[in-house]
Amino acid sequence: FYGGGQERNIRSGTLNVPGIVGFGKAVEISQKEMGAENKRFAEWSGMMFEEFKKIGGVLNGHPKNRLTHNLNVYFPGIEGKSIINSVSKEIAISAGSACTTQNVEPSHVLLALGMDEDTTHYAIRIGLGRLNTLEELNFLIKTISNTINSLKTLSSNI
């Protein structure tokens, strides 16, 4: 497509005015709700980590200077992929960022945070979203905790 002269030959077509107005309204709504959402995510991430600490979970990254809707933890001696495979029918978590899920290399972010290469393979990343409920969060905590305990039992029996 080639733009018209009035668009300096860059963009063809008329501007999507309803889309522009809708986007503006979406930004307005998100700005109003952002503070409450951020607070909720911080509380929920804290809840998850407190429970995971009880079963040996270690936080990857800074405890406060972080995105509140992402929690990255590891459980020493338990491969992240083993955890993911064990819970994949019930919950969606990953071993790295969304853009590197198919990459088998250690996470460059975790390496930059000072983790050694071996430990990066134990990491799991849990992302929260606006539509998640407290019931789902409790289910996630219980499922991952039970999985960790089962994997620890299996590895001690080998």
Stretches found by the model and what they are:
Residues F1-N38:
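Conserved core segment of the aminotransferase class I/II
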Residues I10, G61-H62, I93-G96, G127:
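Thr-Gly-centered strand-to-loop micro-motif
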Residues V17-I20, V27, S45, T68, ...:
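A general structural signal for well-ordered alpha-helical segments in protein cores
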Residues V27-F49, G56-L67:
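Structural signature of PLP-dependent enzymes
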Residues F52-K53, V87:
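Hydrophobic C-terminal alpha-helix "anchor/cap" residues
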Residues N60-P76, G129:
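A short beta-alpha structural unit
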Residues L71-I124:
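Conserved C-terminal alpha-helix-loop-beta "cap" of PLP-dependent enzymes
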Residues P106-I158:
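PLP-dependent enzyme catalytic core of the Aspartate aminotransferase-like
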